Amino acid sequence: MVPELMFDEPRPGRPPRHLADLDAAGRASAVAELGLPAFRAKQLAHQYYGRLIADPRQMTDLPAAVRDRIAGAMFPNLLTASADITCDAGQTRKTLWRAVDGTMFESVLMRYPRRNTVCISSQAGCGMACPFCATGQGGLTRNLSTAEILEQVRAGAAALRDDFGDRLSNVVFMGMGEPLANYARVLAAVQRITARPPSGFGISARAVTVSTVGLAPAIRNLADARLGVTLALSLHAPDDGLRDTLVPVNNRWRISEALDAARYYANVTGRRVSIEYALIRDVNDQPWRADLLGKRLHRVLGPLAHVNLIPLNPTPGSDWDASPKPVEREFVKRVRAKGVSCTVRDTRGREISAACGQLAAVGG
C-alpha cells in the first residue's frame, strides 16, 4: 500500500506580514501605507538584510517616534527560539523554533573550517512519508511563509557574527519539509537569500542548495527560474521497485522522470546535480545497486552528477541502520568505477538528532 502523500498543507498558516515577505515594490507600498518617505523602504531592507537587525527599536537611523509603528506593521516577532542544543564542541547548533501560531520546526547551524552553513526548514513537518526519515514520518503541519524561512537564515547569520565573529557562507534547504512542495515561497526566499543588500543577504547562489525528493515538474520550473542554485535530488535507490518504498513520491514520478528533470536542470543552469543517497544496511547497499546507480547516472547526467552518500542516521522506531564501513567503501568504489563522482557526507549533529532525516521538532 502506497503511503498517502501530502502536497497540500492540512492547516494553512497565515503568519502576520513581515518585511521579509515583501519584494521591493511591496516594501515601498508598506512604507507608503505608514505615511513614511519612500527612502525608508530601502533603509529598512538594509537594516534587515545588511545589518541583520529585525527590531526597528534597534534601528538608530530611524526617528524614535516611528519605530514602534514600523515594528507593529512590518516586523512582527515571527519566531521564538524554544530550545538551542549544541554538539561537536559547539560547532553544531540545533534550534527549535516556535511560530506565532505555535507551529514548531527546526534549523541547524554548522561551522566548518572553511565554511559556515545553516540548514533550514521550508515546511513544518513533511508530507512525503519517507519511512527512514523522522520528519516524513511525522507528517505535514503547514508550509512556512517566506519570512519564516528567511528568519532562520538571518538568525543563523546573526549568531555567527555575534557568537563567533564569523560570516554565513552557505544555506541548504535540507531541514524539515519538501522545498518544492512550497515552491512559490521557497523561490522568493532563494531570491532574497542571493540578492545583494539591501535586497537580500548576498549569499552566492552557488552556495545555496535546494533539496527535493523528485517533484519533476517543479525541478523544471526551478531550472527555468535560472537562479543558479545547487539542486540536490534525494534518490536513495537506483531501481523503482525499492524507491517506491523508500521514497513514496516515486509512485508518481519514476526515477527516469526525476533524472530527466535533473538533466534539464543541469543543462539550463550548467550546474552539477548532487544525488543524495542514504546508505541503509542490507536495504539499498548491495554491490549491484551501486553498479546500477553509477550506470544510470553516467548515462543521464555524465560529469554533471555527484553522489553524496549519507550513512543512515538513527530515528525513533526504526530498525534500519547504517551500512558497515567496508560496504560503504565498496559502494563508493563501484559508483566511481562507472565514471561518476562519489563521496561520503561528513555527518554532523547525530547525537542531538540534528543530522539528515532526524529533525522532528519535539520538545520545547
From Swiss-Prot:
Its main location: cytoplasm. Its EC number is 2.1.1.192. It catalyses: adenosine(2503) in 23S rRNA + 2 reduced [2Fe-2S]-[ferredoxin] + 2 S-adenosyl-L-methionine = 2-methyladenosine(2503) in 23S rRNA + 5'-deoxyadenosine + L-methionine + 2 oxidized [2Fe-2S]-[ferredoxin] + S-adenosyl-L-homocysteine; adenosine(37) in tRNA + 2 reduced [2Fe-2S]-[ferredoxin] + 2 S-adenosyl-L-methionine = 2-methyladenosine(37) in tRNA + 5'-deoxyadenosine + L-methionine + 2 oxidized [2Fe-2S]-[ferredoxin] + S-adenosyl-L-homocysteine. Transmembrane segments: none annotated. It comes from the Bacteria. SUPFAM superfamilies: Radical SAM enzymes. Residues 112-350 form the Radical SAM core domain. The keyword Kinase does not apply. The active site is at E106, C356. Keywords: 4Fe-4S, Cytoplasm, Disulfide bond, Iron, Iron-sulfur, Metal-binding, Methyltransferase, rRNA processing, S-adenosyl-L-methionine, Transferase, tRNA processing. One of its GO terms (biological process) is tRNA methylation. S-adenosyl-L-methionine binds at G177, E178, S211, S234, L235, H236, N313. Disulfide bonds join C119-C356. One of its GO terms (cellular component) is cytoplasm. It is found in: Cytoplasm. InterPro entries: Aldolase_TIM, Methyltransferase_A, RNA_MTrfase_RlmN, rRNA_lsu_MTrfase_RlmN/Cfr, rSAM. Binds 1 [4Fe-4S] cluster. The cluster is coordinated with 3 cysteines and an exchangeable S-adenosyl-L-methionine. Its cofactor is [4Fe-4S] cluster. [4Fe-4S] cluster binds at C126, C130, C133. Belongs to the radical SAM superfamily. RlmN family. This is Probable dual-specificity RNA methyltransferase RlmN. It comes from Mycobacterium tuberculosis (strain ATCC 25618 / H37Rv).
